[in-house]
Curated annotation (Swiss-Prot):
It is found in: Cytoplasm. It comes from Escherichia coli (strain K12). Homodimer. May form a complex with glutamate 5-kinase (proB). GO terms for molecular function: glutamate-5-semialdehyde dehydrogenase activity; identical protein binding; NADP binding. It catalyses: L-glutamate 5-semialdehyde + phosphate + NADP(+) = L-glutamyl 5-phosphate + NADPH + H(+). The gene is proA. NCBIfam families: PRK00197.1, proA. HAMAP family: ProA. Inhibited by p-chloromercuribenzoate, copper and nickel ions. This is Gamma-glutamyl phosphate reductase.
């Protein structure tokens, strides 16, 4: 089965690579329209997936990731339309010039070819990834989690109908609908057909892909994100940022998981934090230095376990640790962070600059929420993933991250001397 999918995707990629920006945008507009026109089919399929997942004991955080609503589905369709409005990087000349030999040389952006994406209970990923791949002239093979099998099947069917109505092969966007995990291992060895693999899931999936894949892998999306509260912070303003970073949508990878508080501001900051977190329904996991003071406040508090500093809660839980200074905060982030998104809240711009320079994450913020690490927020449109590695792509992966380049030399029957 996968062999035939690979062949179909590779053949489709050749056709997609030749499309003009106008032709690709026409396809995307058709997909967005069909997602709305056939929303009832997709939402009914999703309702069945959610019901099964709840019956199987899936956590509330994961159920939130899985669930589609009419508003969310409309937002997904609107994201596709936003991709239409983005500049097409394919065909862009990055640089070039004329050599001493007279050869005119240029470096031009081209599609990667076929992208493979493995993801879990995130039905929006199906459309986000498909739209970005189509905009950049790439075919895609999707493997969603078993929790989203009906939703993904319905969504991909809509996309394939739109492709065919525009005269393009259905092989441009395909999904593996068999939940057999053995197919993941088979997919990881499809280097004959797949040019880049992107896993979007937990640490176990990333480890599996790194160890078994014969395809170049882009890893990321695991977000143990930190906010350091410096001693010069404006407490009321800082609390607004922390509430946003923790509670806006707790199940996302750019949600803050650990709060590092400078010891010199702890006495005034912790009571205010407790009040705010109680109002927001957040459970605080406090270290020994913060525990007694937080227990005197209204928020629910438990003693932090050492391993929780490495956890991506994806829920209304927040670690709180008292640190001696900026050096201590940076050391903690280096030990426990996942190089996703980290922030400092401070009025001291020297400390802010040090934090930016010394914290080696894909996104670093000064006096801003970690929730901004998102393709849409960055103006990239929908994102295919958030990469926390350094080669090829880093941070939210938009259109350019789905391209490579080729060297083109144009001569006049020019030969090398």
């Amino acid at each position: 089965m996968l062999e035939q999918m690979g062949i179909a995707a590779k053949q489709a990629s050749y056709k997609l690579a030749q499309l003009s920006s106008r032709e690709k945008n026409r396809v995307l507009e058709k997909i967005a329209d069909e997602l709305e026109a056939q929303s009832e089919i997709i939402l009914n399929a999703n309702a069945q997936d959610v019901a099964d997942a709840r019956a199987n004991g899936l956590s509330e955080a994961m159920l939130d990731r899985l669930a589609l609503t009419p508003a969310r589905l409309k937002g997904i369709a609107d994201d596709v339309r936003q991709v239409c409005n983005l500049a097409d990087p394919v065909g862009q000349v990055i640089d070039g010039g004329v050599l001493d030999s007279g050869l005119r040389l240029e470096r031009r952006r081209v599609p990667l070819g076929v992208i493979g994406v493995i993801y879990e209970a995130r039905p929006n990923v199906t459309v986000d990834v498909a739209s970005l791949c189509l905009k950049t002239g790439n075919a895609v093979i999707l493997r969603g989690g078993k929790e989203t099998c009906r939703t993904n099947a319905a969504t991909v069917a809509v996309i394939q109908d739109a492709l065919k109505s525009c005269g393009l092969p259905a092989g441009a966007v395909q999904a593996i609908d068999n939940p057999d995990r053995a197919l993941v291992s088979e997919m990881l060895r499809m280097d004959k057909y797949i040019d880049m693999l992107i896993p979007r899931g937990g640490a176990g999936l990333h480890k599996l892909c790194r160890e078994q894949s014969t395809i170049p892998v882009i890893t990321g999306g695991i977000g143990v994100c930190h906010i350091y509260v410096d001693e010069s912070v404006e407490i009321a303003e800082a609390l607004k940022v922390i509430v946003n970073a923790k509670t806006q949508r707790p199940s996302t990878c750019n949600t803050v998981e650990t709060l590092l508080v400078n010891k010199n501001i702890a006495d005034s900051f912790l009571p205010a934090l407790s009040k705010q977190m109680a109002e927001s329904g957040v459970t605080l996991h406090a270290d020994a230095a913060a525990l007694a003071q937080l227990q005197a406040g209204p928020a629910k508090v438990v003693a932090v376990k050492a391993e929780e500093y490495d956890d991506e809660f994806l829920s209304l839980d927040l670690n709180v640790k008292i640190v001696s200074d900026l050096d201590d905060a940076i050391a903690h982030i280096r030990e426990h962070g996942t190089q996703h998104s980290d922030a400092i809240l401070t009025r001291d711009m020297r400390n802010a600059q040090r934090f930016v320079n010394e914290v080696d994450s894909s996104a670093v913020y000064v006096n801003a929420s970690t929730r901004f690490t998102d393709g849409g927020q960055f103006g990239l449109g929908a994102e295919v993933a958030v990469s926390t590695q350094k080669l090829h792509a880093r941070g939210p992966m938009g259109l350019e991250a789905l391209t490579t380049y080729k060297w083109i030399g144009i001569g006049d029957y020019t030969i090398r001397a």
